[in-house]
Amino acid sequence: MTKVIWMKGGRFGLIARYGYKPIFQYKFRPFAQPGAEAADGGFTVLLYENGILSFSTYDANGLFLDELCFTLPGRVLQCFYSLLRNASSWLPSTPCDLRGSEPSLYGSSFAFDGYDPIRVFGMNALLCEPCGSAGGFFARHLYVLFEDVCNLFAEYGINMSLDGFSWSTARIQPFRKNQMYVSAPQQRGVV
């Protein structure tokens, strides 16, 4: 099972069995509606400093089901850090816990290299709050940053949204850990 170790100051620690530091994490977790079970346990997406993107799924109890990996070019890392630099005026002051005014059917967590992780409950409700409210302000900024990251991944065939993840097999092929991958014509490695 993959584990993230959070270090003081919000920095990512190493992930067990990988040896590379994650620089971005997004986790989606649907909650059970009253009187019913959640359909599934959601998913986690991790981008590592070596350009590997990991997509993991979970069952309704939150237990790990499967993991697929994708190789992204170095340009993705450069663009990602450019997005973080652009967010540096507001991201450090973002509360670690954002909640909408109504109970949510799902929760999300966002983590960016060098910043404390942010848990969001009811992103859609928060986006509807007035711009002058703290929740509305930070939710909008966080959502725009997330959309920018999604657009960056989409350039290489990865389609990610708040509640979904898919890929174009015509543009990118997943692999499993311990399989050989090719990240560039001159680089080869094993995850």
Question: PLM features: residue spans?
Answer:
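Short, well-ordered, aromatic-rich surface patches in folded extracellular/luminal domains
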Residues: 1-37, 94-191
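Short, exposed beta-strand/loop patches in secreted or surface proteins that constitute
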Residues: 15, 45-48, 69-71, 110-112
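Generic short beta-strand segments
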Residues: 27-31, 55, 86-88
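A short, structured beta-strand/loop element
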Residues: 43-58, 106-107
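Acidic/histidine-rich, surface-exposed loop or edge segments in extracytoplasmic proteins
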Residues: 55-68
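Generic detection of short hydrophobic beta-strand segments and adjacent strand-loop junctions
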Residues: 68-72, 118-121
